[in-house]
Design a protein with these regions (language model features):
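Active-site donor/metal-binding and catalytic loop motifs
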Residues: 323-325, 329-330, 419-437
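Short, acidic, metal-binding catalytic loop of nucleotide-sugar glycosyltransferases
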Residues: 232-244
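A recurrent flexible, glycine/aromatic-enriched loop bordering the glycosyltransferase active site
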Residues: 115-121, 343, 348-375
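Glycine-rich, basic loop-to-helix element that forms the pyrophosphate-binding segment
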Residues: 268-283
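Acidic donor-binding loop at a coil-to-helix junction in glycosyltransferase catalytic cores
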Residues: 395-404
Length: 454
């Protein structure tokens, strides 16, 4: 598969909403030349979708017609019919994609063009409403609509009857973070999913998103607090901004509670954490996987953030950092992802009393750098394993997280990246913290493990 979006929008949409969806329908408003940073090209070329591309620039439209099988309209979309002045910007490179209707461009956008030294050419172009185009071509049921027109998005959407024209998923350019866009989409029956670059993703409230990531969790029979921790864990996953597939492994013949959703495995024997996680992998059916201890909590946007990084960077693995917490109540009070720069990396353990720190990791026999790790499921193919046998003789090939960074980067020659952010809270205790190693410099460790620092 060859994706063409600027920041992984097309792969995100495929994996989260349209896996296996062939023969769908798209609308691309502001399609430019149909190739450069196109959000719709992949769906037309690789998934057999049909649709409508709209582009007012004559030079870009000529290329669009040459490379795309879609219906291609050379017109500007707004909330009225007629003609208007359209500013074509040219600062070289890709800056023509910053062109737009003169009376809809944000003043900050014009300042940006000035800073770029962009040459401006004013064209008189035909203008039409989006629903006029949809009516003309009989497009009433639309899987995906991309609107990126440098400032006219809000007026176009205000004018569009979304009860008459059923659109499952939108990506909408919001270059300057106008809060009115989210308010409008909620009022029209859409749920905000996430922002990718400057595109905001919305899905229709009755259109389900597909889980892209399986989250593996071991539930220990000997943990006397497992019931409360399990409820907190399940609630934390349910609060993620994108859906996930939970997979729980219970050992010691412990029965899962009836209220627990997700996939469950019960093992009769006691398991190590690596045995439990790798047993859970047998049930994983999503492209991405991550582990999450029963007492740890993810930021509400953590799964979405790590997913888009994997897709944008075309990496096999991404790691982030945790905030160290010393009580379950503190751990449960999780915040959205934020920069790791505000918390120190402390290689020595324990830290000084009262120190708020983040979880680094080391190179000893246990632990990996970036303990909050999401990886592509296919990264397990060809990875070294050691064998663990179930009592009935079934052999499982398992891999602990000891070698994962070096296995992925050196043995499999795959790309691994580190997100320099706090993606959740890690429940720990100074006397038992295992992931810290003595005298490990953070940047040296990143270099040693072959990571790309984002």
């Amino acid at each position: 598969m060859k994706f063409s979006s600027q920041a992984g929008q097309d792969e995100f949409l495929l994996q989260n909403f349209f896996r296996g969806r062939r023969g769908g329908v798209f609308v691309d408003v502001g399609a430019y030349d149909g190739e450069k940073h196109s959000n719709s090209l992949f769906f037309e070329r690789d998934m057999g979708w049909r649709g409508l591309c709209v582009e007012p620039l004559p030079s870009a439209h000529a290329r669009l017609v040459a490379v795309r099988r879609s219906i291609n309209e050379q017109v500007c979309v707004a909330d009225f019919e007629g003609e208007a002045e359209f500013i074509e910007s040219d600062a070289g490179g890709e800056e023509r994609t910053l062109s737009g209707l003169a009376d809809r461009l944000d003043p900050r956008h014009l300042e940006r063009l000035d800073r770029l030294g962009a040459k401006r050419t004013v064209h008189r172009v035909p203008v039409t409403r989006l629903q006029t185009l949809l009516e003309r071509h009989g497009l009433y049921a639309i899987d995906y609509c991309s609107i990126d027109v440098q400032g006219a998005e809000l007026s176009i959407l205000k004018d569009l009857d979304l009860d008459r024209f059923k659109v499952s998923v939108f990506t909408i350019g919001n270059e300057y973070d106008d809060p009115r866009l989210g308010e409008l989409m909620r009022a029209k029956g859409y749920v905000f999913v996430m922002t990718i670059a400057k595109d905001q993703v919305f899905r229709r409230v009755d259109f389900p998103a597909l889980p892209l990531t399986s989250v593996l969790c071991a539930v220990w029979h000997q943990d006397t607090q497992r019931s409360d921790r399990l409820r907190g864990h399940a609630a934390n996953l349910a609060a993620q901004s994108v859906p996930v597939e939970p997979i729980y492994v219970f050992d010691g013949s412990d029965a899962p509670p009836e209220w627990l959703s997700g996939r469950k495995i019960v093992a009769h024997e006691r398991l190590t954490i690596y045995q439990a996680w790798n047993l859970a992998l047998a049930l994983a059916s999503t492209p991405f996987v991550m582990n999450l201890n029963l007492d740890d909590r993810l930021a509400p946007d953590a799964i979405a953030t790590l997913q888009i990084l994997l897709m944008r960077e075309q990496a096999a693995m991404v790691g982030g950092d945790w905030k160290i917490c010393y009580s379950q109540a503190e751990t449960d009070a999780v915040e959205p992802c934020y920069s790791a720069g505000g918390l120190p990396f402390v290689p020595q353990w324990p830290p000084a009393p009262g120190t708020t720190t983040r979880l680094g990791s080391g190179t000893g026999s246990r632990g990996t750098y970036g303990p909050a790790v999401m990886w592509r499921l296919d990264a397990h193919v060809g990875a070294p394993r050691y064998t663990w046998r179930l009592p009935e003789g079934t052999a499982l090939k398992v891999a602990g997280d000891t070698a994962w960074w070096t296995v992925v980067t050196e043995h499999l020659k795959r790309k691994a990246v580190r997100f320099p952010g706090i993606i959740g809270n890690y429940h720990s205790h100074p006397a038992t913290q295992a992931e810290f190693r003595q005298d490990v410099d953070e940047l040296a460790l990143i270099a040693q493990l072959g990571l790309s620092l984002l």
